[in-house]
Amino acid sequence: MRTVSLIIVHCSANKAGSALRTEDIDRYHRSLGWKCCGYHYVIPTDGTIEAGYPEELVGTHCKHHNSHSIGICYIGGLDDGGTTPKDTRTEAQKATLRKLIEQLHQRYPKALIVGHHDLNPQKACPCFHVTAEYIDCLLYTSPSPRDMRR
């Protein structure tokens, strides 16, 4: 089993309300010469979770960090005109993303929860401050000081 030290949140950089699905991302990533959809999970606007790359395998979503991370992508991230980065998550996406991050952090309690832009400041992705939004997930699932002494 590989060591996962990062849970990285991305956006697909599509217009608000885009009907994009995992198979669309898969097709695009294959056109770039990748094996398949580089994200482990994709969250369309309806809030469902779609599986991308198997979690136990290394994805292709964040240069220099793929080997030790899980990649989650929500569909959206651009304004209605498709030109300006914007947090376009639907309420369903927000709820699903929170649940998925909580589940992943329980499986990988030492993993940091970050946005793509936290690792590459030239990116706007995912268009919101991931660490600030999910700090309570880290606090809730972090080991207690007693557990850390073991």
Task: State where each predicted segment sits.
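Secondary-structure boundary/capping signal
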Residues: G33-C36, P109-L112, R149
